[in-house]
Amino acid sequence: RFWQRGDDAPAAVPAAEPAHMGARIFAALLALDLVLLLLTWGVRALAGQSGTSAQALEFWRCTDSRHYLDIARDGYIAAGDPDRVVQLVFLPGYPLVVRAVMRLIPSDICAGLLTSALCFAGAGCVVYRLLRLDLPHRGAVRALRFLVLAPGCFFFAAPMSESLFLLLTAAALYLARTRRPILGGLCGAYATFTRSLGLLLFVPLLWELVHDAVQRRRVDARQVVGALLVPLGFAAYCYINWCVAGNPLQFLIYQREHWNQRTGLFFSTAAYQTDYFLRSLTTGGWRDALGLWLPNLIACFAALGLLAAAAPKLRASQTAWFLAYYIVAVGATWLLSAPRYLLVLLPVPLA
């Protein structure tokens, strides 16, 4: 049956496992996070941009990091600087955690880096436990390595939402599969409060619910409640939009007007990304061609190819989650960071 394909794995794969594996993974990923920070500093130093330690830290305020840190420090604003007003499009889950850490560390950039480091290390531990439900120790470690060493892994160290989102999605799936669906649903709800793509966790949770209902010939009410909790995080975000801007969907307007961002189709994305890549090459824009458009194209097609090859071996819920996530994430009409969006999609390293 199609909903059972790949779903007959035991509750845990019996295999020898080194002692204190969680602590080892946590320490290893904290060390990797530090290495990523030092490598970034080293590359900038070689480029003649090292500066003081304070300036080295300020570098991490680039790209979307500054938006998350502004929100953590000052919250959302309804009027004033247009660049600050449109920050409503960035969900509050990560900034709220950074704001809590700022009670201990007043510097927003240091609090953001620490938050990401701890979430990255914690995510590694939870991802390993999730992988062990289907894989032996070596297979789980191999998949975890693919995840944390993938191109774009520096996003896990940056003061951005990737590490927290990975932690929450892995926790939601692990708790759901180990018969703690309410806790899993709460983690899923906070994932949707952190990134809108967290809404798509509803797909694997619903799939597991249907699979278990068929296997047991009854529906577990706790699984239903757990799955229904997931959209509540996004509903809370829409409520914040209403409080700040008077429109629960104001973020869609800002995305369209400020970033020309809408929901589209993967085929259109591949077409315009290829077009921009070729245009950049012909006009001498090598930096954009090799640093933006080519990595996007490689990430999009590589992830799809990996999943196509591995689909028969994956749980059906994982395949369904990948397809739903991929269609929405890659279908954006102005996709600038496909490696970043696909980095936190767990079926990719499994493939």
Model-predicted segments: where are they?
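Transmembrane-helix signature of polytopic, membrane-embedded enzymes
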Residues: S107-A111, V127-L149, L167, L183, ...
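Transmembrane alpha-helix segments characteristic
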Residues: A309-A332
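Loop-to-helix entry region of an early transmembrane alpha helix in multi-pass inner-membrane enzymes
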Residues: V85-L88, P92, L96, L104-C125, ...
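Transmembrane-helix motifs of polytopic, lipid-linked glycan transferases
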Residues: A100, L114-D134, A302-A308
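Multi-pass, polyprenyl lipid-linked donor-dependent membrane glycosyltransferases
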Residues: T115-C119, D134-R138, R142-A176, Y190-L201, ...
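Membrane-interface transmembrane helices that cradle and orient dolichyl/undecaprenyl
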Residues: L135-H137, A172-L183, V210-Q215
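Short hydrophobic/aromatic helix or loop-helix immediately within or flanking a transmembrane segment
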Residues: F59-I77, D83-P106, Y272-F277, A329
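Membrane-lumen/periplasm interface segments of specific transmembrane helices
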Residues: L32-G51, W60, Y190-A191, F202-L306, ...
